[in-house]
């Protein structure tokens, strides 16, 4: 019969793997996550008290949630969706609505990254239902902000701004005590980065005047990330570089882009590599500028490696 000690060890292993993912990207985490799943999935069929079983379902659901995110970051979309589906089933068994909301957020992000914006919005809406059942204001703010991002990518300017305002209000009203590991990344710095990403995409789809606000928000986010959030900082630098180029400040755009390239070196993330490609396209529009030309060429070299 298993006890709380086995569940606690699983929770601690998931926490350590999540920290590695934020710091180094999904690719370096794949083997560790797969090993952790092999070692801990048999616990689901072991005898346990009702209290231990409920907590075990949450812990394994969160490990599946992390496995889905790691696979997504590594470019393994089918594997990611499979893990997320298992996470939803286990979170449902445990009636863990806060975790269900987080899994829906991450599923939405998969579709958002791959350009399926309406599907992303559907998952963000499903997540809002779970967040509302649990009264989880932090999850609600995260989901509203990401729905704003999907709308910005679609060019739905009014909806993007309205949803971003709602997300900020929900974040401000949310309790920050006892935040679960799967949601702990959503700090003021991350909210600023998310708002910056919304404005950066609005600068592309709705008007370049959004670039200046994006620059301010992204700079705040980048300055606020600690060393453990290296991937988030790199993604912020990519968006910052793009926003500077759209605004016409080529020197600042090139500087931010080169910083992004330098910081991406130790990070194993297909998602980061994907996000560099639109930046290279923006840089190529300024081939007469030697720095922009160099930035595009260096991104191409990294992509080809």
Task: Give, region by region, the residue ranges found by the protein language model.
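Conserved binding/catalytic microenvironments
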Residues: 2-7, 11-305
